[in-house]
């Protein structure tokens, strides 16, 4: 073990004593391997008290700014991964740094409210400015949560509560329901299920793993509910050259949804909710068409099933809209839309018909984080003030064009270029080649990441401009040539 003074010295070297960065570097700057010696030393220390198996490198957050992340060894990388798609305005945006120094945020940090019982006096105003102002069409009610997984988990609980109330003619639980549930018996503990999709990712809690099918390592050794998993479209690209094939994908997947609803009903295990991502991000950036989602909405309406759209990774503007489902033109809005990541706090919007009447059924100590809500309020203001959604559309259109050109010149190393806005991906022939590319790109100063079995994904922030795009593709081209 390092002596206490030596450990403090190492951390002090990394953190430095300078103020928070307030400008981007002129470009990437790499002086060591990544992870470098300081990152490796910090990881060794961390490993003595905490798991480190997923740690890539330690970050100097004081020196990181805008679209650039700086690691413990001083390497500056252009970041198109942005904390797994969770930084709306990049690193240390001045407007957010200013909010972080305000008394109302400090008091929420020091005396963290248990929001379900003791909310701040200005909590409703914060909800209105940060969340209601960007609410999905047709949904105004919102419930904050800690993260995307807890948002999805509690959205499903809400769906179950509503579904059972409908069975009781709109009434709450009676004495028999309350007594039997304590022994996990009917009618208080019903047989109900939630439908997910092949390739989906909705979180790693016990409940959400039952609707997650992206990577085996997430699920192995963990008990799961007997819930249906339906097929999700697997399109061929370019879309305009594969219309018939992709249309058949939609039809086959919708037929599978109908078949599994019927099958689980025969098992006395009704499908109470269907949860779906607009883009299966963790699973490999798989897309569904508006026609597919329209069909899915019509099926849920026909069967009285709650339709939950998981926008944890897609929400926040990277697709060119705050909500990726905005362009679906549904016959009626989703019943619920979950969010987190770029929207800084977790939670879900829901239709008024789903409001839970009884206290403590949707509840935990924190029920979200008011400090994140305060930051989101300012982030939304900046997004509107600076026209960042419009910028995302413009830069995103160019990004899609350039990604297609990169694929065409790759000599077969890339295929299936796809995306919406700056939310984009491209495939490699194998996962091992993709992983080799990611490591080489990082050594060249571009921080990117993988998803699915063999996909490379791009998740830049909303302050990502044409200048950053040009540099991104210079680095991608350099990396591809060195592969």
Swiss-Prot record:
N6-(pyridoxal phosphate)lysine, modified sites: 341
GO biological process terms, semicolon-separated: gamma-aminobutyric acid catabolic process
UniProt key word Transferase: yes
Keywords annotated in UniProt: Aminotransferase, Mitochondrion, Neurotransmitter degradation, Pyridoxal phosphate, Transferase, Transit peptide
Recorded GO MF terms: (S)-3-amino-2-methylpropionate transaminase activity; 4-aminobutyrate:2-oxoglutarate transaminase activity; pyridoxal phosphate binding
Major subcellular location class: mitochondrion
SUBUNIT field: Homodimer.
Superkingdom as given in the UniProt entry: Eukaryota
Annotated catalysed reactions: 4-aminobutanoate + 2-oxoglutarate = succinate semialdehyde + L-glutamate; (S)-3-amino-2-methylpropanoate + 2-oxoglutarate = 2-methyl-3-oxopropanoate + L-glutamate
Entry similarity comment: Belongs to the class-III pyridoxal-phosphate-dependent aminotransferase family.
Cofactor: pyridoxal 5'-phosphate
UniProt-annotated binding residues for substrate: 204
Subcellular location: Mitochondrion matrix
NCBIfam families linked: GABAtrns_euk
Binding of pyridoxal 5'-phosphate, residues: 148-149, 365
Gene Ontology cellular component terms for the protein in this record: mitochondrial matrix; mitochondrion
Annotated EC: 2.6.1.19, 2.6.1.22
Pfam families xref list: Aminotran_3
Protein's name according to its UniProt entry: Probable 4-aminobutyrate aminotransferase, mitochondrial
């Amino acid at each position: 073990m390092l002596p206490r003074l030596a450990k403090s010295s190492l951390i002090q070297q990394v953190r430095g004593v300078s103020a928070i960065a307030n400008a981007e570097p002129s470009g990437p700057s790499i002086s060591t391997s990544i992870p470098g010696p300081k990152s490796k030393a910090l990881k060794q220390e961390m490993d003595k008290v905490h798991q480190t198996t997923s740690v890539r490198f330690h970050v100097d957050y004081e020196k990181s700014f805008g679209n650039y992340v700086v690691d413990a060894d001083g390497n500056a990388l252009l970041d198109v991964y942005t904390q797994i798609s969770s930084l709306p305005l990049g690193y240390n945006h001045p407007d957010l740094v200013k909010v972080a120094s305000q008394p109302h945020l400090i008091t929420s940090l020091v005396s963290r409210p248990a929001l379900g019982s003791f909310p701040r006096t200005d909590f409703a105003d914060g909800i209105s400015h940060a969340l209601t102002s960007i609410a999905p069409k047709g949904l105004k009610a919102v419930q904050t949560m800690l993260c995307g997984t807890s948002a999805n988990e509690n959205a499903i609980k809400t769906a179950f509560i509503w579904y059972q109330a409908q069975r009781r003619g709109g009434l709450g639980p009676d004495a028999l329901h309350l007594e039997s549930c304590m022994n996990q018996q009917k009618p208080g503990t019903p047989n109900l299920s939630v439908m997910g999709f092949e390739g989906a990712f909705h979180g790693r809690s016990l409940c959400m793993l039952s609707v997650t099918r992206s990577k085996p390592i997430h699920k192995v050794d963990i008990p799961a509910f007997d819930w249906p998993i339906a097929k999700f479209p697997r399109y061929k690209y370019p879309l305009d050259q594969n219309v018939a094939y992709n249309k058949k994908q939609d039809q086959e997947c919708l037929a599978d949804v109908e078949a599994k609803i019927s099958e689980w009903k025969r098992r006395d295990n009704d499908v109470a909710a269907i949860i779906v991502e607009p883009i299966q991000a963790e699973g490999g950036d798989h897309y569904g068409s508006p026609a597919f989602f329209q069909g899915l909405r019509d099926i849920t309406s026909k069967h009285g099933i709650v339709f939950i759209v998981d926008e944890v990774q897609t929400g926040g503007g990277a697709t060119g809209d705050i909500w990726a489902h905005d362009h679906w033109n549904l016959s009626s809005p989703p019943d619920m839309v979950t969010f987190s990541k770029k929207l800084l706090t977790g939670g879900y919007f829901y239709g008024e018909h789903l409001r839970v009447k009884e206290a403590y059924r949707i509840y935990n100590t924190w029920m979200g984080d008011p400090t994140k809500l305060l930051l989101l309020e300012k982030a939304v203001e900046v997004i509107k003030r600076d026209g960042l959604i419009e910028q995302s559309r413009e830069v995103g259109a160019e990004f899609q064009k350039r990604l297609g050109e990169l694929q065409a010149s790759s000599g077969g190393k890339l295929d299936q270029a796809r995306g919406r806005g700056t939310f984009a991906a491209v495939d490699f022939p194998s996962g091992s080649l993709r992983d080799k590319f990611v490591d080489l790109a990082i050594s060249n100063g571009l921080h990117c990441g993988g998803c699915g079995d063999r996909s490379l994904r791009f998740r830049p922030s909303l302050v990502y401009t044409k200048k950053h795009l040009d540099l991104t593709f210079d680095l991608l081209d350099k990396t591809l040539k060195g592969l």
